Every structure is written in C-alpha cells, then in structure tokens.
Amino acid sequence: MATIEDLLEEVGRPYQMFNEDGTYQGCFYPVQFLYPDKPRYNMPSEDIEKNYLYGLARIKKHCVEIQPEELQKGDIIVTRFRDELHVAVYYEFSKIIHVFKDHTLQLGRLKLFKEYKCFRVKE
C-alpha cells in the first residue's frame, strides 16, 4: 500500500481527470492513490450541487468524521471550492496534498479553506 511519503513524491506531477476504467478521478486522485482498495467514484451529473452531495456521501460511507484537532497524516479533507466538491489529503503541520491548478498534485495549506470537514478512512 502507498504511504503519504509516496504521495508526497508525486507532488508536481500532472494527473488525468479519469481513471483507465472511465471513473472520475479529478481531485480524488490523492485519496485514490493512498487508498486504492476503496471504490472509485463516478460523478453522476454535471450539476455541481449533486456532485458535491454524491461525493460527500461516498466519502462518508468509507470514512468516519473527525474533528480538525484530530487530523493525522493521510486523513481526508472535504470542502467546497468555487462551489464544487474539493478533496485533499492531510499531510502535517496544517499542510495538505491536493490537485489544484494546472492539473498537478500540489502541497498546499489547510488555511486556504474557510470551512471543511475532516474524515479518517475506516479500516
């Protein structure tokens, strides 16, 4: 299984919006990289609100919600960014690994988001 350090080595590399099987990858890329045994998500609609609710429901199915002060490496951050679902992986010291500009994996700061939910993947 990949580690958070393996994911960190991917920072700066471009990614594809869709997996080889046609399922949506987008900003889920870091989550799918770390947790390849979890189901992939195929966004059902072009409706931003429906996709946000669908993506959040899928994450809740495989994760348990935690408080921000409980965050550990590999936990998942879910937020709205420009009214769309955005997913990131917590690294450490308020840093996150996520897909952002230019379709590349980037190291960013959690304070970029005003509101977010935190999740830990169920074993």
How should each PLM-predicted stretch be described?
Residues 1-62, 73, 81-85, 122:
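N-terminal capping segments
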Residues 63-66, 82-123:
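Aromatic- and glycine-rich peptidoglycan recognition patches
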